[in-house]
Curated annotation (Swiss-Prot):
Involved in DNA repair and RecF pathway recombination. SUPFAM superfamilies: ArfGap/RecO-like zinc finger (SSF57863), Nucleic acid-binding proteins (SSF50249). One of its GO terms (biological process) is DNA recombination. Belongs to the RecO family. The keyword DNA damage applies. Signal peptide: none annotated. Gene3D superfamilies: Recombination protein O, C-terminal domain. This is DNA repair protein RecO. One of its GO terms (cellular component) is bacterial nucleoid. It comes from Chlamydia muridarum (strain MoPn / Nigg).
Amino acid sequence: MQIILPGIVLTHSPAEKQHVIAKIFSPAGLLSAFAKNGASLSCDFRESLLPISFSLFTIQHTPPKMRKVLQGELKNPFTTIKNSYRLLQSTGKMIQAILKTQWQEKPSPQLFSLFLNFLQRIPETPHPYFFSSMFLLKLLQHEGSLDLSHSCTLCKSSLESSTVYRHEGSLFCEKHAHEKTILFSQEEEQILRIIVQAKKFQELMCLAEFPIDIDSKIDSLFSSFLTEKMNVLP
């Protein structure tokens, strides 16, 4: 069976000879696909297989064999990202987040669209690392692992006008905070909620114009989510 689908190459690794195995994120989820002679200069779609490239792929799927890339039409090579260390570092953070949270072949059309939009806009922001942290928050929201209530998970006391503590997917008051919780001031919590509730990219772009020092806390929050995820795996 042959299918045509859009996809963003997250990673690729060499196979024997000049073959390539690409990890592609698409609306159909994470896919691993084999490209015969994909690293060869004679391959007319070689550039479409490079990491951080958006392409339209023709893929052959004959279970139980691995998917095979028959053709790739490069749509966006994201050259600006590849030519900047800061942008590469920030984009790499988003890629690793996807690789660590998404199941193989689990359809994620909304997350795919979100990631593609972030890739298209990250070169426009003066603070790409903060912008990539916004993606981590959006990913937590997508996974249903971000408590947006206004009360402590344990005692249900109101947190609307106070400092809050977050860990994994939960929200805590000062009394029930523990050594692994991450403190968010009232202002930081407000910014977090603005990011999560933003419906338009322009809102995120406006926030990313300012050097808001919250990205390290968002990254730590995401790391705690990954720890929780690993602990529940069989």
